[in-house]
UniProtKB/Swiss-Prot annotation:
PANTHER family with a match to the protein in the record: SMALL RIBOSOMAL SUBUNIT BIOGENESIS GTPASE RSGA
GO cellular component, one term: cytoplasm
Family of this protein: Belongs to the TRAFAC class YlqF/YawG GTPase family. RsgA subfamily.
Protein known as: Small ribosomal subunit biogenesis GTPase RsgA
GO terms (BP aspect): ribosomal small subunit biogenesis
Chain's role: One of several proteins that assist in the late maturation steps of the functional core of the 30S ribosomal subunit. Helps release RbfA from mature subunits. May play a role in the assembly of ribosomal proteins into the subunit. Circularly permuted GTPase that catalyzes slow GTP hydrolysis, GTPase activity is stimulated by the 30S ribosomal subunit.
C-alpha cells in the first residue's frame, strides 16, 4: 500500500485505528492486493456518490465502484459513512473490512438491510426528557447497536423539561440487562463536552442516533463548539421535530474524536435473532437452563425463565418485550422466504 500523502497521523485524526500501517490481518491482505492505492474514510454518502477524507476538513469527492451503482447490488455491501476504502486517484477501488456496524431493516415492507454507519466505537442514543421519552424504544436502539459490536450510551436531553431526571434514569436501568451508561445533559450548554468526554477520546468514533426533535443537531453543535448543524422546531403536541439532518456525515471534534450525525429514524426493525442476544443476555442465559432445549417459556415444566419470573428476578414486562421483538424478527424472516418462492 502506498504511504498516505498526509501521513498516518492525519488518518488517526479521522479515526484510523493504528499509529501506522494496519495491524489487522484482513486489512493487511486487502492492502497488499491493492498495493498502489491509499486509504481514506467515507465522511458523506449521497445518491450521486461519496465524499471521503484523508485528513480532517479536507473532503474529496470520489467515484464509487461501478458495481455499487447497479440496483441489483446488495446495499449492505456498498460503503457507508464511517467505512474505510482504498483509493486510486479519485476513485474507490476497494472496501476495507468493517470492525463494527449498525444496521437495520429498511423502513417499509421490503426485507432489505440498511447500514446506518460503520467502524464505530460508541453510539449515543439521544432522547429528550419530554414527550419523546420512551424506554421501550431506547431498548430497541440498544438491541440494534449492541448486535453490531458497538457500545450504546443513552444521552438524555431537555433536562429542563423533566421534573425528576433521576426517576427517568432509574426506569431506563430497569429496562436494561446490562450496565447501561446513561448521561443526562442540557445539550445547549457546554456541560455535554465534559459529561461525554470518556467516549470522545482522540481516535474514537461516535454516532448520534435518535428520533427527530430529540436534540441531536443541538448536541452536535455543542460538541463541535460552533453552529454548524441546522436546528429545527419541535411540535408541542407530540414532541416530534422535522428532519434537520438530511444525510449522514462524519465530523471531526475538537476533542480528537469523530462524530457521525444521522437523520432521525422512525422505524427500528431488526435483521436477525442474533440482534437480541446482547441486550437480552439474561433471558438467553436462563433459556440454557430450561429442561427442554425447545422450551417456549410459556407453561413447560422445568422452564428456568418462568421460574425467574416466579421468584422475582426477571421482570415479566421484559420477557413480554423479548417475545415481541423476537416475533418481529421471525415474521420478517418468514416474509423474506416467501418472496424467494
Amino acid at each position: 500500500m502506498i504511504e498516505p500523502v498526509v501521513g498516518y497521523r492525519m488518518l488517526q485524526a479521522i479515526g484510523w485505528p493504528w499509529p501506522g500501517p494496519p495491524a489487522d490481518s484482513a486489512w493487511q491482505a486487502m492492502c497488499a492486493m491493492y498495493s498502489q492505492c491509499r486509504p481514506a474514510r467515507v465522511i458523506e454518502q449521497h445518491r450521486s456518490g461519496y465524499v471521503v477524507a484523508e485528513a480532517p476538513e479536507v473532503p474529496i469527492k470520489v467515484e464509487s465502484l461501478p458495481a455499487w451503482q447497479r440496483r441489483s447490488f446488495p446495499p449492505h455491501e456498498r460503503a457507508v459513512v464511517g467505512d474505510w476504502v482504498l483509493l486510486d486517484g479519485r476513485r474507490i477501488v476497494a472496501l476495507l473490512p468493517r470492525r463494527t456496524v449498525i444496521k437495520r431493516l429498511a423502513a417499509g415492507e421490503h426485507y432489505r438491510q440498511q447500514l446506518i454507519a460503520a467502524n464505530l466505537d460508541t453510539a449515543f442514543i439521544v432522547c429528550g426528557l419530554d414527550g419523546d421519552f420512551n424506554p421501550r424504544r431506547i431498548e430497541r436502539y440498544c438491541v440494534l447497536i449492541a448486535s453490531g459490536g458497538v457500545e450504546p450510551v443513552v444521552v438524555l436531553t431537555k433536562v429542563d423539561l423533566c421534573v425528576d431526571v433521576a426517576a427517568a434514569v432509574a426506569v431506563l436501568r430497569e429496562h436494561s440487562s446490562q450496565a447501561l451508561a446513561v448521561v443526562a445533559v442540557d445539550a445547549r450548554k457546554a456541560e455535554p463536552v465534559v459529561a461525554l468526554y470518556p467516549w470522545l477520546l482522540p481516535g474514537r468514533t461516535v454516532a448520534l442516533l435518535g428520533s427527530s426533535g430529540a436534540g441531536k443537531s443541538t448536541l452536535t453543535n455543542t460538541l463541535l463548539g460552533e453552529q454548524r448543524m441546522k436546528v429545527g422546531e419541535v411540535r408541542q403536541r407530540d414532541s416530534r421535530g422535522r428532519h434537520t439532518t438530511t444525510h449522514r456525515a462524519l465530523l471531526p471534534l475538537p476533542s480528537g474524536a469523530c462524530l457521525i450525525d444521522t437523520p432521525g429514524m422512525r422505524e427500528l426493525k431488526f435483521t436477525g435473532e442474533e440482534d437480541l442476544v446482547e441486550e437480552f443476555a439474561d433471558i438467553e442465559l436462563l433459556a440454557t437452563q430450561c429442561r427442554f432445549r425447545d422450551c417456549a417459556h410459556q407453561a413447560e415444566p422445568g422452564c428456568a425463565v418462568r421460574a425467574a419470573i416466579g421468584c422475582g428476578t426477571l421482570d415479566p414486562q421484559r420477557l413480554h418485550h423479548y417475545f415481541k421483538l423476537r416475533g418481529e424478527i421471525v415474521g420478517a424472516a418468514d416474509r423474506s422466504m416467501l418472496r424467494r418462492y
